Amino acid sequence: ELYSLPFNMYTFNKMWGVVTPEEAKAKIEEQRKEITKEPENLEEQAISLVGRDIYEKLIKGYTEKQWGRDCRELPAFIIKRLPVRLTFDNNYFNALYQGIPVGGYTKMVENLLDGIEVRLNTEYLENKEALDALAEKVIYTGPIDAYFGYELGTLEYRSVRFETELLDQENYQGNAAVNYTDRQTPWTRIIEHKWFEFGKDSEGNDIPKTVISREYSSEWKLGDEPYYPVNDEKNGALYARYKKMAEKEEK
């Protein structure tokens, strides 16, 4: 089955057969009533926002793959709100003007960095003193616990692994990204890269082959690439302690 995301009238029509915003809203409101108290976990929070059907079909499996935990073990505050559109607008973003840089983001960043010194394969924390001496203000974008040598303990992160494959076919899935929201499929989504630039080469010709990447979410351990932090109360409290240490930094 294929559903349109974010949740919109195409989604609700496929799931329930409803054809008007009033019908869709009534269906969601009916199912939201299942939760009668303050949500205590992510499952209850999601159902209180969009109902049982959408939760089971499009949220539960994907979320559990993403976090590696049962939704009932995840805190409710992870989901503040779930966008629901009672229109047939299935665009992911709401911005009036949307686009992708011609040639991709790598080319755009290369242009931005033209004339700026860039050092590759250089570990900041291993060369901190020398690198700090180069500027009056330093912007560090790595893990905050690593910055302080894990002095207070290690924050929990999730990592992501990609399997990329070149296929001898012109069109694999007809879309740049397809999420797999069931729990059984091991990957969270498949990216078909050519559709980010509309499947054409630099001269505007169709490309006869395609490249796909399967994305897998996994537990993180030291040495892995941390993609996003585990957002729960324990890690939030530890982060707050590290943040206080960071506020005392002079540079």
Task: Give the residues covered by each predicted segment.
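Active-site/ligand-binding neighborhood in enzyme catalytic cores
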Residues: 2-6, 10-137, 141-148
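Mid-domain catalytic core of redox enzymes
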Residues: 1, 125-245
